[in-house]
Amino acid sequence: MRELQRLADQLERSWDGDAWHGPALGELTQGLSAAQAHRHHLAEAHSIWELVLHCTAWVREVSRRLGGTEPSLPLEGDWPEVGEQSEAAWEAAREALKEAIRGLARAVREMDPALLDRTVGEGRDAPLGTGTTFYVMLHGVVQHNLYHAGQVALLRKLA
């Protein structure tokens, strides 16, 4: 399997797939009501819904970077607000994350492999994910999804 295919596969597994780490974001968020997803179980901790919106924003930001956009915080914001709290809005948030991940995986499969060695942005800014290669950034977005999947798994137990 070529490297781009492996990266795309790992991205997709962060949403739904036979992942070694355990349940992926799709499985972890499936079957939750809007109220369960929006509940704040811990003071100063994000809700499951907020985590889904945050992951979506960053997956989209990485997609924009692959398309040639200069790195910045996501257009949606680092932690987008939930807004309407309906079942339809919750399902739309889940669907948006799934589609963002699938779209990024498609873009990775189609990208020029030479881009993997190019540097993202000008200087090192760890929270922004710059100053590393596209290869590291793509692994980083997978790691980011899985980090938050762990949080969702814990919050789901409290739901």
Segment roles from a protein language model:
Residues V82-G121, Y135-V141:
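Acidic/histidine-rich alpha-helical segments that form the ligand environment
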Residues M1-G22, G26-T29, A34-E81, G121-A159:
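Short, contiguous alpha-helical
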